[in-house]
Amino acid sequence: MIIDGHSYCLPQMDSKVGYPTLEHKMKLLQSELGGHIQPVWNVTDRKKADNSTLIDQHTGDLRDVEWTRVNGGLAWKIDGQTYTKQYVPPMLHNLECPPEVLIREMDYAEVDVGLLHTYPMIGTPKFLNDYLNKAVQKFPKRLYRLISITEGDLIRDVDKVIEMIDEQRRLGGVAGLQFIPGFYYQTLDDSSPDTWDSASLRPFWDAIYKMNLPVYFTLIGGRGSKIYERSWMDSYLAEQKVLLGWLNRYPGLNVVVTHGLPWTGYLENGQINFPEEIWDIFKSPNCHLQILIPIQMGARWEYPWKESEPIIKKAIERIGANRIIWGTDMPMVARFCTYKQALDQFRVHCDFLSDAERKDIIGGTAARVMGITN
């Protein structure tokens, strides 16, 4: 069985998706696009531009833009010019990836199962949980989903969040909870010493532990850090230390670190060199790692991403293939490669892998974590 451990169904990008107004949603999208590495260009002459057309590079403030579509793609107008970037791949002509599109891609690439992830930009938890539930109910045993929450709600009404999660998991097709610590910190005062593993959240995590619900942690750095600067890397390691303490408190509960490790942050002279402490969380036998090389390194390396093989080999040595999960970020990975190519990195290449290791990485590990037995 081949399982894509990290994929998406996407509602239309320029729709409200549960937010109070479309303007509210588009500001979230502007913030996301304005910090993203995908290139910007002027739609008139295709000359390169940059993210300063979205975000003031000195203050971090959002620019006053007018959103539009050009040739079916998202674009924005500012200072009399129209700009775009290919955040979603061109094939998503209506800025959406409904489950039918994902299933067709899976069928063609010979992927049996996809695990649908969440993110605030895709929709509010109420909207997104309903949207993804409909997808997995339409394609049972082909699609599974993670539960979306607003991490800040844990400060305001933890019991309500627990109740919602319990209701969602009873609907079926749920493989776990996605938790993004960085969004929890956004609701705290900068002077607060609390973390998402502080005593105030113990009732929440105790409830998740009692449910035996796997947790998919998306570590995006801590407070006030800028991605891939030294402050971000330091805060990433600090976040791992919080997770290590959490793992020790809740032994036996399956955990997955999504997106892999910060490959780009530790890229030096074409090689990824991690500090020793980055492996500490995997001392817990229940801590698993997703690996999504093409979506993260596709702007730098070409298929079959041979440059990544030394760090993949090291990850297998330090963690074990039985705790590594292949994922793609589909449909987003189509910015850089086909679905088959993303799979063939492990199905065909990485010659150092044994047959058993290949099977674990491209499906066996995910199946065990997700509780799939057939």
PLM feature segments, named:
Residues M1-G5, Q12-H93, C97-R104, Y108, ...:
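Mid-to-C-terminal alpha-helical segments outside catalytic/metal-binding sites
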Residues H6-D14, T218, H259:
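Histidine-centered divalent metal-coordination motifs
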Residues S7-Y8, P120, G260, D329-M330:
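Active-site metal-binding loops of divalent metal-dependent hydrolases
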Residues K85-E96, L146-V158:
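Active-site mouth loops of central-metabolism enzymes
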Residues P89-P90, E105, E110-G123, N133, ...:
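Short, well-structured secondary-structure segments
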Residues E96-M106, N129, I155-Q168, F274:
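Short, acidic/polar
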Residues P140, A175-G176, F183-Y185, D190-I325:
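Catalytic pocket-lining loop regions of alpha/beta-barrel enzymes
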